[in-house]
Amino acid sequence: MIITRTPFRISFFGGGTDYPDWYNNNPGAVISTTINKYCYITCRPLPPFFDYKYRIRYHKKEETKNIQEIKHPSVRECLKYTKTIQGLEIVHHADLPARSGLGSSSTFTVGMLHALNALHGKMMSKRQLALDAIDIEQNIIKENVGSQDQTNAAFGGFNHIEFNKTKKIIVNPIILSKMKISKISSHLMLFFTGFSRTASDISKHQITAIKKNKIDMTHNYELVEEA
């Protein structure tokens, strides 16, 4: 049995400049950090005694005979991406609900990839996990997502992350003393409003507006460098 624990994130500066539509033509950067709230993925081989091959548990229950029947897009495409053909039971648990604005879908994808690769006996680098998750979400599932959530989930920690048209993601850890980290934490408050929303829908409007809001986007990038 493989269990992965992958952190959620909060973003401070640079949001929007991590979309490929922006950083393919302009420099992009964010300052963000992962937090002590996690997504847990449990993955184990399923004995061949059932009339289905894949048993998947999240807020829904799925039992399917083949990968193509799986409705959860990230589970389905991660299985294909890692060329996993054996029967599996996959169970998802999380400290926070989905669609809470903390990068939960990308955190799930990174954790799923990590679990499946571990099941195959492969230890992926943080960078490769991030790049694979970005590829799956942006190019295969066609989600309207940026590139910071996957990078944060894969690398963890407090980081200054740079994006550019070469597709090379540069992760610069922000090294702070325990005293400074404690001071920052003591000035942060995070609330759950009880409302949820689909990030892809919001991002779709943001991506459409990128060309129109170049001044604002450039300012977002400059704020990162100033911070």
Give each language-model segment a name.
Residues 102-126:
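DPxDG-like acidic metal-binding loop motif
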